Amino acid sequence: MSGLRALLGLGLPVAGSRLPRVRVQAGACRARPTWWGPQRLISGGRGDVEGMASSAVKYLSQEEAQAVDQELFNEYQFSVDQLMELAGLSCATAIAKVYPPTSLSRSPPTVLVICGPGNNGGDGLVCARHLKLFGYHPTIYYPKRPNKPLFTALVTQCQKMDIPFLDEMPSEPTLIDELYELVVDAIFGFSFKGEVREPFRSILSVLNGLTVPIASIDIPSGWDVERGNSGGIQPDLLISLTAPKKSAAQFTGRYHYLGGRFVPPALEKKYQLNLPPYPDTECVYRLQ
């Protein structure tokens, strides 16, 4: 058992009764194109704002999302690591709003961040680093690491902050439920196409059996970017980046946030994104 705890990067008992944690509401309403306008505080919220009426945020196709990204890189000269840092910070901020450390049973709260091989995985690494600064205890599973300086640097940053990396992911959902209070899905983003291959097919199968909440970055992994996937993982929190993708219309979880407050006004106008007005200095906006 001690060897298993060392593998998982946690000094926590596996056996025994399950600790109380945030409940996931079943039967949440299906997401719809979000309307924003005059803002009001959400009842019972923590200072979040919600749109009341006026104009719909645009949900992007895969082609549109790729075109927006390319303009950010080429026309506006944003770098990949710059956008990754802003996106990852947005994700950690949304998570802290929905699952503040004081609402979870452990101190510090334990979070498993699962990162894929592309930019979505990079967002997850940045998110994990900021979660550590926000008072959480993140652990990272990163099975397919690209041999690129950007990703190597992100890993080093996490290691220097004493964020553990798993050599193996627990193969049983019940074990993850016992050890972690939240799972961050940073496996695949909007550029993913084709069939899910190993080891990610098995990972998604395990995630499908969890009872702890899942927070998905931009796209729930395994979903078609435009059509969604009713049989895939069903996150409790979806954090759309830049603008929601069409599959977000199939999201049935409790919380949908928009993150990535970096879109130039001219680019927003060109693609008719109709983004909501972020309040004050916030880097996230609650859509649902």
UniProtKB/Swiss-Prot annotation:
Molecular function as annotated in GO: metal ion binding; NAD(P)HX epimerase activity; nucleotide binding
E.C. designation(s): 5.1.99.6
Positions annotated to bind (6S)-NADPHX: 119-123, 189-195, 218
Cofactor(s) needed by this chain: K(+)
YjeF N-terminal domain span: 65-275
SUPFAM superfamilies from the UniProt entry: YjeF N-terminal domain-like
Residues recorded with modification N6-succinyllysine: 144
UniProt cross-references to Pfam families, sorted A to Z: YjeF_N (PF03853)
Subunit field text: Homodimer. Interacts with APOA1 and APOA2.
HAMAP family, per database record: NADHX_epimerase
PANTHER family to which the protein is assigned, alphabetical: NAD(P)H-HYDRATE EPIMERASE
Protein name: NAD(P)H-hydrate epimerase
Species the sequence originates in: Sus scrofa (Pig)
